[in-house]
Amino acid sequence: NYMKPKLLYXSNGGH
């Protein structure tokens, strides 16, 4: 999920 908001980066590790 690289196109998703930065709020998800924390959970997805930037994926």
Curated annotation (Swiss-Prot):
One of its GO terms (biological process) is positive regulation of cholesterol biosynthetic process. The keyword Secreted applies. GO terms for cellular component: cell cortex; cytosol; extracellular region; extracellular space; nucleus. The keyword Acyltransferase does not apply. One of its GO terms (molecular function) is heparin binding. In the nucleus, phosphorylated by PKC/PRKCD. Keywords: Angiogenesis, Cytoplasm, Developmental protein, Differentiation, Growth factor, Heparin-binding, Mitogen, Nucleus, Phosphoprotein, Secreted. It comes from the Eukaryota. It is found in: Secreted; Cytoplasm; Cytoplasm, Cell cortex; Cytoplasm, Cytosol. Plays an important role in the regulation of cell survival, cell division, angiogenesis, cell differentiation and cell migration. Functions as a potent mitogen in vitro. Acts as a ligand for FGFR1 and integrins. Binds to FGFR1 in the presence of heparin leading to FGFR1 dimerization and activation via sequential autophosphorylation on tyrosine residues which act as docking sites for interacting proteins, leading to the activation of several signaling cascades. Binds to integrin ITGAV:ITGB3. Monomer. Homodimer. Interacts with FGFR1, FGFR2, FGFR3 and FGFR4. Affinity between fibroblast growth factors (FGFs) and their receptors is increased by heparan sulfate glycosaminoglycans that function as coreceptors. Found in a complex with FGFBP1, FGF1 and FGF2. Interacts with FGFBP1. Part of a Cu(2+)-dependent multiprotein aggregate containing FGF1, S100A13 and SYT1. Interacts with SYT1. Interacts with S100A13. Interacts with LRRC59. Interacts with CSNKA, CSNKB and FIBP. While binding with LRRC59, CSNKA and FIBP seem mutually exclusive, CSNKB and FIBP may cooperatively interact with FGF1. Belongs to the heparin-binding growth factors family. This is Fibroblast growth factor 1.
